[in-house]
């Protein structure tokens, strides 16, 4: 009886700690942008706000062509400045680029919601894309979304919803076939919370499993999106993964991309979010080839 009571008490403690830790994981400590477009020599840019369902998203707009638009996301716990390198490349190709902080990140609004969080992040992508097209582009502009790590999940979900008129999608270091894969990957890579009393490998592993489970519950998403849903069947998609990515293993990304006929998968010799750094030439060669193909098709269809 005492053993059973102790086991139940241990399980209850793990569930309690996991609830707090999962909430904190999806509402991370903020990191304000640490670099700005002007640090890269861009003069024609400004700060803008995107109105969303519960507040405002803070962003930077890099002015370019009105018929070439790009929305750029970031990883969990980071801010828009983490994706400046990719944004600068797109801007040099002539794109008008919007980098923005997801809710609960950077300088965007705080959303204290504890459930339905995946839907809210997807709404961020949709609202930012719609604002970019309506206020800073032409009606028939090519609109590209580039997501990295965590933001690849809501970016793909936004294409599946089909309301944001996304013409092409690039995903760097994600997403995987399961929502739980992202969180377990973080923990496997050593980014799990250090909780007093959970120092043994066994207790820590049990806690991390519980945190991942509770985080998935809080996201509240049906994943992965069905191949025929929304615009998935018509939208060209490029997925870039790293062969040594221990947060989002390439096998997990491949299991997802195998579901979609319009998906192209490129595997580089690098880790998580390291492709544009460690394999820079090939990373941007693959990206440029994809963009050229997308732009050509868009033009042939009668768009600008």
Predicted regions and their residues:
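An N-terminal hydrophobic leader/cap segment in hydrolases
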Residues: 1-51, 57-60
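Active-site glycine-rich loops that stabilize anionic/oxyanionic intermediates
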Residues: 67, 74-78
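Catalytic nucleophile-loop/oxyanion-hole region of alpha/beta-hydrolase
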Residues: 79, 105-136, 141
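Conserved alpha/beta-hydrolase
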Residues: 87-110
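Hydrolase active-site cap/lid region
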Residues: 160-218, 267
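Short beta-strand/loop motif that positions the catalytic acidic residue
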Residues: 232-233, 239-241, 245
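Conserved alpha/beta-hydrolase "acid-adjacent" motif
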Residues: 246-252
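Catalytic histidine-centered segment of alpha/beta-hydrolase-like enzymes
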Residues: 270-284
